[in-house]
């Protein structure tokens, strides 16, 4: 679809959202005006909204919130909510289906999850000012049984194989190279979905729950293969999340890949309860230490940086991609940073550093309180 339009629309996208507090709307006290202002807003959901179910044993951490908390997402201004998450089935299929229904009842469009695989693969299409925007979502962080199949509920899978390749075969016990690649069946289904949707919409956005959590800069090998394939099949913008930390922004063939948008609004106040757990956290990220001033948000220091991705769509194409630097405070509330806040430059410099570290040549240009992403 390529008929020109004189209209322009804006899209905002953020990473992981997990609300579990007495006053759910308060988590968006500082960002609701920004999210609401966009014509379309997207987020990734990391919790169930249900009073039913029991924790499934195949996941270490389990997230569930009251159904009433879902209204906070609509209050904030979100339209499209990906539920293709490694926590989507934490409390079983009843809680999973409750969440999908609750999102719909609150006026939002769930994505990447459904009562069967066909529903989980189904795109969301939104029209604004004569411009059609299509969304697809896939999950590669998959506890056993969390993916949809046949008539089984779950999220839309993009399963990944991991191989450990010995670098020096003649040296037993030396470090290995970690190789990752997508399962052929899921990968082909994803490409078919994108090609089909490409013919139906003006703008196509694909969301991936993927990557290496908490680790500074590192990207998994499969992210590059999958992200590039998505664009080769017709995707205009890739939104990545799950890592709970910002990752590099890549420009591939003129299209932007946010490898990780980081956390956005995430209630998490769990402290390490054993020396072993403390050591495990530090092995992921050396900044993961308990800070009493951040008792309501006990993620690593690096996880306090986040962004609101912005996309300007003009003449039925993406004409500009940018982001708003933001900081997550000790009450787990994201705050948009002003240009004169020193944390603004710290975040931009952090992204520049990890972008260079991964070998991307993406350029960042500050424009007021936005940062434009340049190829």
Residue ranges of model-derived segments:
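Acidic, metal/ion-coordinating pockets
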Residues: 1-375
């Amino acid at each position: 679809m390529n008929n020109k339009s004189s209209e322009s629309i804006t899209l905002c996208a953020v990473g992981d959202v997990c609300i579990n507090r007495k006053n759910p709307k308060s988590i968006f006290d500082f960002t609701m005006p920004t999210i609401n202002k966009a014509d379309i807003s997207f987020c990734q959901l990391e919790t169930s909204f249900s009073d039913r179910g029991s924790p499934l044993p195949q996941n270490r951490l389990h997230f569930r919130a009251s159904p009433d908390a879902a209204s906070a997402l609509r209050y904030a201004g979100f339209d499209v909510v990906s539920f293709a998450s490694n926590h989507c089935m934490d409390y079983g299929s009843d809680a999973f289906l409750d969440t999908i229904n609750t999102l719909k009842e609150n006026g939002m469009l769930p994505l990447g999850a459904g009562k069967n695989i066909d529903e989980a693969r189904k795109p969301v299409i939104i029209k604004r000012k004569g411009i059609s925007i299509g969304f697809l979502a896939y999950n590669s962080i998959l506890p056993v049984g969390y993916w949809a199949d046949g008539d089984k509920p779950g999220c839309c899978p993009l399963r990944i194989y991991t191989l450990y390749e010995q670098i020096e075969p003649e040296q037993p016990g030396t470090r290995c190279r970690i190789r990752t690649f997508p399962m052929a069946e899921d990968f082909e289904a994803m490409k078919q979905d994108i090609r089909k949707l490409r013919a139906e919409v003006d703008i196509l956005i694909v969301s991936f729950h993927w990557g290496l959590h908490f680790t500074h800069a590192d990207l998994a090998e499969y992210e590059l293969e999958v992200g590039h394939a998505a664009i080769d099949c017709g995707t205009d913008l890739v939104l990545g999340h799950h890592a709970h930390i910002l990752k590099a922004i890549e420009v591939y063939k003129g299209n932007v890949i946010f490898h990780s948008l980081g956390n956005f609004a995430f209630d998490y106040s769990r402290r390490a309860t054993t020396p072993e757990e403390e050591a495990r956290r530090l092995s992921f990220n050396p900044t993961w230490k308990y800070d009493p001033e951040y008792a309501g948000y006990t993620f690593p220091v690096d996880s306090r940086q986040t962004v609101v991705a912005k996309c300007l769509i003009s003449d039925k194409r993406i004409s500009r991609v940018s982001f708003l630097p933001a900081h997550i405070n000790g009450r787990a509330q994201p705050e948009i940073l002003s240009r004169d806040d020193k944390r603004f430059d710290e975040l931009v410099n952090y992204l520049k550093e990890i972008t260079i570290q991964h070998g991307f040549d993406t350029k960042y240009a500050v424009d007021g309180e936005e940062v434009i992403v340049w190829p």
